[in-house]
Amino acid sequence: MLKKIFISAVLLLAVLSIVVSMLKGNNNGEKTVSVPDRVAVINISGTIMSGTDSNDNLFNQTSGVTSGSIMKQIREAAADDSVKALVLRIDSGGGSATAAEEIGRELKRFKEKTKKPVVATMGNTGASAAYWIAVCASDKVYANATTLTGSIGVYI
């Protein structure tokens, strides 16, 4: 009985070794990594502010995004050859017009440099500066039927 268990275990290990060696293949010690095409997603939520982080703005708000952080993500997507498209995921009531203009210019540079599509999607809200960013350089803008959107303008 013990002999049968031992023989079965040896046979099982032999079969497993063959299967593993077949799956592993022969790559001469080189690691092969395949990176599929990707879509870069940039989230723009909360108040849109100028600067590089939330401590740079006048009111020291902690919820929101800054033009510097968004522009950095756009540049990273432009530099990554595996990125085939850019999606802006927007849920913001707006913010600084200056920040929106900075982000818009960076999006236009992205499109000119890469020729890759830009798509904006809006969640609960896409208003004011956020809406301006969405329509600035996007090939398509998508919103839910209940998305609060629009309101590009100024008060005099």
Segments predicted by a language model, with ranges:
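Small-residue-centered hinge/linker elements
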Residues: 2-116, 123-156
